[in-house]
Swiss-Prot record:
Protein name in the entry: UDP-N-acetylmuramate--L-alanine ligase
Keyword Ligase assigned: yes
Keyword Oxidoreductase set for record: no
Gene3D superfamilies from the UniProt entry: Mur ligase, C-terminal domain, Mur-like, catalytic domain, NAD(P)-binding Rossmann-like Domain
Length: 469
């Protein structure tokens, strides 16, 4: 590939999955350029590396490109895509380019409806601590690296495998992890849960016969496909039948978890005491997946324990903004999380309850996609009812048309009718920082949540309330 193609252009280069691949190709010596609809921290970072980034889309941007990479968010009527096809320049989906990168190394792919980014980051951190210098491509910013990708000199590449558009079926890893299987992105699968499960099964069968399927045995969706898996299986979880099992699980004040990992995957290994620098039982499961990967790679215990204890987190995954002043003179804790599915929200709320026992929990949530809001409506209402207060924004459309009775106002009405709490509806996300300031109380834990533009809100809250410090 390197000899045939020298200039690769990315349409939508600012996306989490796209930017990481672009950076790795740049570091491999390719000439990389790209365009994106809007400027932001990611595009500015890529530009600082010497990658030419254009804001907006225009056919002129692909001049000289010998391949054009697109994400699923880029449609066929994009002028750069049209120009590439008219010039017979190959238009390559992001996942296909990622698969080409994986051919250069031994691939470890992490899939699942929830927990992919954190688990991928933990695997990369453990391999780095073990001196294996991995390459990684992650859907979020690994705080310790300051980036969502890195080109390493070692033999392994660790990637986040995306099921949302079934693009993970392009990958050919030697080790695969499935954290869970839940009903999300169902438009891709014709609203057929069976088709979604079959896609995960096919993903596991993309491995060679000597690969290992590392799967969460606690998850009902994953358990349902185990009888059909024709690769060696390593299960992890809290259940007695798990080969990699967590026992004596304890939530520590401040947001760490302590547990003992029992390892019975073919060979009985000594129990491994773990301190995990992340909150919540869901993150204990993510750590068990990593311990299973380490066992398959026959890594020593010390780097596993050290990396999990020192893990510095991932951007927008229970990301702490610290203690901030309230306008009335008190203090509150601000946290941001990418969670946008009811299962993810429930896990974050449970983690916050464990990390900050007895404190009032305020959720500021921006729903993501009308279809998800419609499909998970009752679950959203139930989960948000577990908070002490809710600030609710309008749906971030992500290109979708509005759906009647599947918007933020409908969620707010349903919460109000349920009688558990009185939500505050915030029509414009730009008003959310002030809404947080107006409603926060001394001692609160405030968590901003969602996959859309709410990601900018925590920084705006810090800026707004900094004057009160």
């Amino acid at each position: 590939m390197k000899h045939a193609v020298k200039h690769i252009h990315f349409v939508g280069i600012g996306g989490a999955g796209m930017s990481g691949i672009a950076e790795i190709l740049h570091n491999l010596g390719y000439r990389v350029s790209g365009s994106d609809q809007s400027d932001g921290a990611t595009t500015r970072r890529l530009a600082s590396l010497g990658i030419r980034v254009a804001i907006g889309h225009d056919a002129a941007h692909i001049a000289g490109a010998e391949a054009v990479v697109t994400s699923t968010a880029v449609k066929g009527d994009n002028p750069e895509v049209i120009a590439a096809r008219s010039r017979r320049v190959p238009v390559v989906p992001r996942a296909v380019m990622l698969a080409e990168l994986m051919r250069l190394k031994q691939g470890i792919a992490i899939a699942g409806t929830h927990g992919k980014t954190t688990t991928t980051s933990l695997v990369a951190s453990v391999l780095a601590e073990a001196g294996l210098d991995p390459t990684f491509v992650i859907g979020g910013r690994l705080n310790s690296a300051g980036a969502n990708s890195r080109l390493g000199a070692g033999d392994y590449i660790v990637v986040e495998a995306d099921e949302s558009d079934a693009s993970f079926l392009n990958l050919l890893p030697v080790l695969s992890v499935v954290t869970n299987i839940d009903a999300d992105h169902m438009d891709t699968y014709g609203h057929d849960l069976g088709r979604l499960k079959h896609a995960f099964l096919e993903f596991l069968h993309r491995m060679p016969f000597y690969g290992a399927a590392i799967i969460c045995g606690d998850d009902p969706g994953v358990r349902s496909i185990i009888p059909m898996i024709s690769r060696p299986v390593v299960s992890y979880g809290f259940g007695e039948d798990a080969q990699i099992r967590a026992v004596d699980v304890l939530a520590l004040p401040g947001g760490q978890m302590r547990f003992t990992a029992q390892r019975r995957n073919g060979v009985v290994m000594p129990d491994l005491p773990i301190t995990l620098n992340l909150p919540g039982r869901h993150n204990v499961l993510n750590a068990l997946a990593v311990i299973a990967v380490a066992a398959e790679l026959e890594l020593p215990d010390a780097p596993v324990q050290k990396a999990l204890a020192a893990f510095d987190g991932v951007g927008r995954r229970f990301q702490r903004y610290g203690e901030l002043p309230t306008p009335a003179g008190g203090r509150f804790t601000l946290i941001d999380d990418y969670g946008h599915h009811p299962v993810e929200m429930a896990a974050v709320i449970a983690a916050a309850r464990g990390a900050f026992p007895g404190r009032r929990l305020v959720i500021a949530f921006q729903p993501h996609r009308y279809t998800r809001t419609r499909d998970c409506f009752e679950d959203f209402v139930k989960v948000m009812g577990g908070a002490d207060a809710v600030l609710l924004g309008e749906v971030y459309a992500a290109g979708e048309a509005p759906i009647v009775a599947a918007d933020g106002r409908a969620l707010a009405r349903a919460l109000r009718v349920g009688g558990k709490l009185e939500p505050v509806f915030v029509d414009e996300i730009a008003a959310m920082p002030q809404a947080i300031a107006d409603n926060v109380q001394d001692g609160d834990v405030v968590i901003t949540m969602g996959a859309g533009s709410i990601g900018a809100v925590p920084g705006q809250v810090v800026e707004l309330l900094g004057a009160h410090a």
